[in-house]
Amino acid sequence: VAMRPLSTPDRPGRPARDARPDWLNCRLCPRRQARAGLPITAMSNTHEVRPGQSIELLKALHILTRDGKMNQDSRRKLKQVYHLYQFIEPLLQNARDARGAVTLVDHGAGKSYLGFILYDLFFKDRRDASHIYGIETRAELVQSATELAARLGFGGMSFLNLSVADSIASEQLPPRVDIVTALHACNTATDDAIRFALAKQAQSIVLVPCCQAEVAAVLRKNKARALADPMAELWRHPLHTREFGSQLTNVLRCLQLEAHGYQLSVTELVGWEHSMKNELIIARHQPGRPRREPARRLREMLERIGLQELSERFQVPAQP
């Protein structure tokens, strides 16, 4: 292959991009391919798709077009789900190693992007009793997801038309599950997902909280009384009330989970920059972990900030 000079005046000793073999310079975006008169292939648009991923599934989820291409929005969605899968896959493998099969419940499933991708990448080739349950309040989404699972032969998937709160007592779900996920379950639905996970003795919980309005509403209601404490400056202004309430909600959730014996990891999702709700909370149950200190801190925070009326929402185990 013909080569150009190996250095440029501004970068001595460093190969310029065009100094590389032509085959290394051919990764162009579709628009540049068109300008260069090159054919635009489906592969040029789908290089992000994981090996073994069902193309039919990606088309059904409208991540790929009918001719197998991908636009910027669908590329972003796929990147988000794949990034989240990197966190969930080890939890799935640990549960499978421990119990031989995995039961996962996805709350606020929506169109079940996450559930379908998880099943396609992890579950479909394993011939065991593993199962994914998608919980969703919109009946039309439950129906369409059920039909898609049947069409793809994903027999280990079920979709239930329930609220997160109603699912706790539902007999359609097993008495115990391994993993609970809740992505952007609005406002208190995330707290209901936590209660569900605790009731079902889940080994792992994966949360991307959303719309934490309840705590902010209580802060706003009690603001006049709280202003005697200089700490109330943290939420005196309306914008700060909303932002502080959002962060405080997640802090209280983390303390609640720690009080129930979970080890917490809190991080930021990469590729979700378009959304301000990109905080990822992963909780793994650790038998024998200290529980008294996080429970004490949780109660003191509720009292100090004037949120005692939310004690039932952020319930902790009774201490001996």
Outline where the language-model segments fall.
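Conserved alpha-helix/loop element of class I SAM-dependent methyltransferases that forms part
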Residues: 80-100
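Class I S-adenosyl-L-methionine
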Residues: 32, 40-59, 66-67, 73-75, ...
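Conserved SAM-binding motif I beta-strand of class I
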Residues: 131-136
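Intrinsic-disorder-associated, low-complexity terminal segments enriched in Asp/Asn/His/Tyr and depleted
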Residues: 10, 18, 22-25
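Conserved class I S-adenosyl-L-methionine
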Residues: 100-110
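Conserved SAM-binding loop of SAM-dependent methyltransferases across substrates and taxa
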Residues: 111-127
